[in-house]
Curated annotation (Swiss-Prot):
Composition-biased stretches (Acidic residues): 247-263
Gene name tied to this protein: Ttgn1
Protein's recorded name: Trans-Golgi network integral membrane protein TGN38
GO BP annotation list: Golgi to endosome transport
Domain of life of the native organism: Eukaryota
Residue ranges, annotated region (Disordered): 20-101, 113-299
Residues bearing PTM Dimethylated arginine: R74
Membrane-related topology note: Single-pass membrane protein
Modified residues (Phosphoserine): S234, S235, S271
Organismal lineage: Eukaryota, Metazoa, Chordata, Craniata, Vertebrata
Biased composition regions of type Low complexity, renumbered to the chain: 129-146
Species the sequence originates in: Rattus norvegicus
Stretches that traverse the bilayer: 304-324
Amino acid sequence: MQFLVALLLLSVAVARALPSASKPNNTSSENNPPIQPSTPLPPGVDISQQVKTNRPTDQRLESDKEGQDKTVARTSASVSSGVESATNLNLDDSKKHPETADAKLKETLQQLLPVDPKQEKSGQKFTKDSGSPTGGDSDNTTGGDSNKTTGVDSDKTSGGDSNKPTGSDNDKPTGGDSNKPTSKVPSNTETPKIDKVQLTEKGQKPTLISKTESGEKLAGDSDFSLKPEKGDKSSEPTEDVETKEIEEGDTEPEEGSPLEEENEKVLGPSSSENQEGTLTDSMKDEKDDHYKDNSGNTSAESSHFFAYLVTAAVLVAVLYIAYHNKRKIIAFALEGKRSKVTRRPKASDYQRLNLKL
């Protein structure tokens, strides 16, 4: 695809170059009348002689312009034929190998472009033959414009446009984008490590470490009594501790320092024992809670199980009795219904019968 885009740009540039090269030549011949010398003529020279000398220069200009138009037409035909041949031959190769296709394109353009220096040489020869006034004008109109239109435009289309899709687009994903993630990842990973080191140096995290160490040593060793107190004090603000120490130092004498140490030693084991007791009590309470939960779950399951067993046993007993006493149950039901329909005669009924008789 890049190769096809470059070919289209080349064809557009050549199409623009041809009319632009022909227009300046026509305008220069129409707009530039025969130049008259600014210096005064000598008295012995006639104006007719000077006009005769200028006429051959005009004829030479026209012949040279025709030759340049022919060369431009030839170069355009050769460029178009070269482009068509390159497209016909290298379409398959460009799809398979775009780099080799770009290299071949550059080679063909380099082979076709060296026609321009010949035009420059012809323009220089023309200036030498025709003289200073006509040579300068002809170079400005024909040589400069033809070089600008053919050489510069073809270079722009071939060099700039053909290299843009290959160089810049191919280099961006490999060079720029591939290096960015690799450079950013280590920076992100290194920053938390540096922050951790700085925090430990400043003394922000030793409080947590002291708490964990104090908790472990309370469970393990009961002799170290001062460290748990320090761990408890570490949670308090540092400013309050400093103010308390200053007040104690001002109010109490120096002799009271050993007494304080003894009091701390006396209070240390008791506080450590109390803390150990609280820890053990909390552990026991947690264990009891676990046991209670487990026992409650097991008892609930067992109670449901026994209830199901009892109900099943009662149902089995009732069904067994009913199966073996079918006749009695049926006779009892039938006799009850008959007794309601047929009654036994009472004594009063018999007495009434006797009276009638």
